[in-house]
Amino acid sequence: MSISSKIRPTPRKPSRMATDHSFKMKNFYADPFAISSISLAIVSWVIAIGGSISSASTNESFPRFTWWGIVYQFLIICSLMLFYCFDLVDHYRIFITTSIAVAFVYNTNSATNLVYADGPKKAAASAGVILLSIINLIWILYYGGDNASPTNRWIDSFSIKGIRPSPLENSLHRARRRGNRNTTPYQNNVYNDAIRDSGYATQFDGYPQQQPSHKNYVSSTALAGFENTQPNTSEAVNLHLNTLQQRINSASNAKETNDNSNNQTNTNIGNTFDTDFSNGNTETTMGDTLGLYSDIGDDNFIYKAKALYPYDADDDDAYEISFEQNEILQVSDIEGRWWKARRANGETGIIPSNYVQLIDGPEEMHR
């Protein structure tokens, strides 16, 4: 059996929520922004169509193209309601934004023709199209922005379903993860966690690493499986690995002197790394799934975090775990952009730090 087959655990298919796009009016009622904006749009449309019909029924001249703009606006309002009821707003954001932009041009053009016309009936029609233009501009700002934008997050914070997940932020996350993983295997995320926990943090992935103010643990299991198996490793990386090995050996010797009960643990640390970091037959204690975290005790998960958004683990990365929105997770390491965490069902792995928020007490779990 090759070393890589020992080190790499078999990827597990993450559990994903079933996406239900059936017609549900509660999807529309649960969003205060949708209810308020669409209700105002309907009222404005009624004012515009009423003023237009009254003005056209008299001998006053009425711009004919305004009729198409009013009908087009009605189609936009109906489409928005359907997208919300079927929970398809995020799937058609580009279409919604561009179609509303066209309606904005139609309404502003009609307002230009009606606002300077004489007669109270045309004044009512002009007031309706002006209100529709304002609402369309607000819609363009909202639907044209990503869910991670400040305005969208503030608006979605009033929704019963909470803040919507950002497809852009999620795709950038995974693209960065794949790019880092293809550069040097195990130099990112889990491997950096092992280096950081040993007190020797370096900049491997192009992003500045912070020195931790505390050490949660130095476990032989956490360091298992990260021996250097790359024949073309650069001298700089070898220097870091040698320094890390010396620190681990020093810690092992100190433990042997002070506590004889840890002899087995120190033996595992010595056997995990090859002395010259060659590609020889190096034994590893990596488990079949996430052995990296299998021996971490409950005492090491000293933090609690609340999931701000749902997250689906990457199929290509067996170390990531999925979680639901508002789920409470136990966290053992809060340094860097990826944290070690444990779910309530005992599943352990790494999670993106910007998808969760640390909580101090039980009262914050229900916010």
Swiss-Prot record:
Gene Ontology annotations of biological process type: regulation of actin filament polymerization
Key words of the record: Cell membrane, Cell projection, Glycoprotein, Membrane, Phosphoprotein, SH3 domain, Stress response, Transmembrane, Transmembrane helix
Pfam short name (any one): SH3_1
Membrane topology designation: Multi-pass membrane protein
Comp. bias intervals (Low complexity): 259-272
Subunit relationships: Forms homooligomers. Interacts (via the SH3 domain) with PBS2. Interacts with FUS1, STE11, STE50 and RNA polymerase II.
Family membership noted in the UniProt record: Belongs to the SHO1 family.
Protein name according to UniProt: High osmolarity signaling protein SHO1
